[in-house]
Amino acid sequence: PSEQYQPYPEQQQPFLQQQPLELQQQQXXLVLFLQK
């Protein structure tokens, strides 16, 4: 189970790293819009 648990987080990390790029651009904008 330990070996299966490791590959899981590794696959989830790249998926989350690719999403933040698009989310950061949208959030940013939103954060700047809200801060303004």
Curated annotation (Swiss-Prot):
<dbReference type="GO" id="GO:0045735">
    <property type="term" value="F:nutrient reservoir activity"/>
</dbReference>
<protein>
    <recommendedName>
        <fullName>Avenin-A</fullName>
    </recommendedName>
</protein>
<keyword id="KW-0758">Storage protein</keyword>
<keyword id="KW-0020">Allergen</keyword>
<keyword id="KW-0926">Vacuole</keyword>
<dbReference type="GO" id="GO:0005773">
    <property type="term" value="C:vacuole"/>
</dbReference>
<comment type="similarity">
    <text>Belongs to the gliadin/glutenin family.</text>
</comment>
<keyword id="KW-0708">Seed storage protein</keyword>
<comment type="subunit">
    <text>Monomer.</text>
</comment>
<comment type="function">
    <text>Seed storage protein. Serves as a source of nitrogen, carbon, and sulfur for the young developing seedling.</text>
</comment>
<dbReference type="GO" id="GO:0033095">
    <property type="term" value="C:aleurone grain"/>
</dbReference>
